Design a protein with these regions (language model features):
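Conserved small/polar residues in nucleotide/adenosyl-binding loops
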Residues: 185-191
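Sec/Tat signal peptide C-region and signal peptidase I cleavage site
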Residues: 15-19
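N-terminal prosegments of processed precursors
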Residues: 20-113
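Non-catalytic propeptide/linker segments at domain boundaries
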Residues: 115-182
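Short, flexible beta-strand-to-coil junctions
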Residues: 80-81, 131-133, 186
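Sec-dependent N-terminal signal peptides
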Residues: 4-13
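Sterically constrained small-residue positions within well-ordered secondary structures
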Residues: 10, 24, 66, 106, ...
Length: 192
């Protein structure tokens, strides 16, 4: 019994020591990556459109290199120096659904896709992969993100849409604020 407890304790300590620390690899900012998925049902391609920096990160900070859900696409962020996976997420896109239509057999189209990733502290490689319904890789694309790149647009600090909190349950690290539009104008909203 003592031996089983020792082995179990060893595995628990080992699992905890492997956990990534968000602050080791990422800043409290968001990297917005805009891609264009193009093609038809026979051939697909991914193109990088634009990179933007947003003022804060509101996503997960734990289990960063694990997939939260299975999708028909993945984004993998690797530290450029060590090649270690530092962030991974999955998605499903309208482009991949469109590929199963009759229109995709006859014509090629492009679909815009935007993804929000944690902003890396050091240069990182971002890989995006599209899978078929049978989980075969259809196409993939890799690019390097250098956090100090002057071509990364800084957004979200000016020209911010006017807003006010009706209820603020806590800070953004612990709470999610949900806004439900109901077609009010600034003239019909009560002022307090």
């Amino acid at each position: 019994m003592k031996q089983i407890c020792s082995i179990l304790l060893f595995f628990l300590i080992s699992a905890g020591s492997y956990a990534q620390n968000f602050a080791d690899y990422f800043q409290n900012k968001t990297l917005r990556v805009d891609y264009i998925f193009t093609g038809n049902n026979k051939q697909q391609a991914i193109y990088l459109d634009e990179l933007s920096q947003l003022p804060s990160w509101a996503g997960r900070e734990h289990h960063l290199s694990e997939l939260p859900l299975e999708g028909n696409g993945q984004i993998i962020v690797r530290d450029l120096a060590t090649r270690q996976c530092i962030y991974k997420t999955s998605f499903s896109s309208l482009f991949q659904e469109w590929l199963s239509t009759d229109e995709a057999k006859e014509t090629a189209k492009g679909f815009e896709n935007t993804f929000l990733l944690p902003y890396p502290k050091q240069p990182a490689e971002v890989e995006i992969v599209l899978f078929s319904p049978r989980k075969k890789v259809m196409t993939s694309f890799k690019h390097i993100v250098r956090p100090d790149d002057i071509l990364i647009h800084k957004r979200g600090t000016s020209h911010v849409t006017p807003h006010r909190y009706i209820l603020q349950s806590g800070n953004e690290k612990e709470c999610i604020d949900v806004a439900i539009p109901v077609s009010y104008t600034h003239l019909t909203l009560p002022t307090t």
